[in-house]
Amino acid sequence: MDSNTVSSFQDILMRMSKMQLGSSSGDLNGMITQFESLKLYRDSLGEAVMRMGDLHSLQIRNGKWREQLSQKFEEIRWLIEEVRHRLKITENSFEQITFMQALQLLLEVEQEIRTFSFQLI
């Protein structure tokens, strides 16, 4: 995984965790959980692409990987909509910056996952 993407994920998760401390919002906790899940999925997909010989074992081991891929894209779209909504309603500049960076990261990761998936098909 690109080191910038790793640090971006870590930065966004840290910022959201700080925001969570000041909020009782369950939605924010759900977003943090989905960001962490997305990071792990993106990492594993990237590793599979780097080990192209692992492609067949990936397909054999998990015959439903295309279905999972589709589910991840739906999760990304949900996260994008949720982040956009949060961005519209917040007036706190720290939160605005965090959500703008989260939105940019989601769009980048969506593109990376698309690229990886095309290489795996």
UniProtKB/Swiss-Prot annotation:
InterPro entries: Flu_NS2
GO cellular component, one term: host cell nucleus
Keywords assigned by UniProt, alphabetized: Host nucleus, Host-virus interaction, Transport, Virion
Top-level taxonomic group: Viruses
Note: Average number present in a viral particle is estimated to be 130-200 molecules.
Signal peptide: none
Similarity annotation: Belongs to the influenza viruses NEP family.
Name assigned to this protein: Nuclear export protein
UniProt entry tagged with the keyword Repeat: no
Record's subunit section: Interacts with protein M1. May interact with host nucleoporin RAB/HRB and exportin XPO1/CRM1.
Protein role: Mediates the nuclear export of encapsidated genomic RNAs (ribonucleoproteins, RNPs). Acts as an adapter between viral RNPs complexes and the nuclear export machinery of the cell. Possesses no intrinsic RNA-binding activity, but includes a C-terminal M1-binding domain. This domain is believed to allow recognition of RNPs bound to the protein M1.
Gene: NS
One BP term from GO: exit of virus from host cell nucleus through nuclear pore
Disulphide-bridged cysteine pairs: none
Subcellular location: Virion; Host nucleus
Organism: Influenza A virus (strain A/Silky Chicken/Hong Kong/SF189/2001 H5N1 genotype A)
Short sequence motif Nuclear export signal: positions: 12-21, 85-94
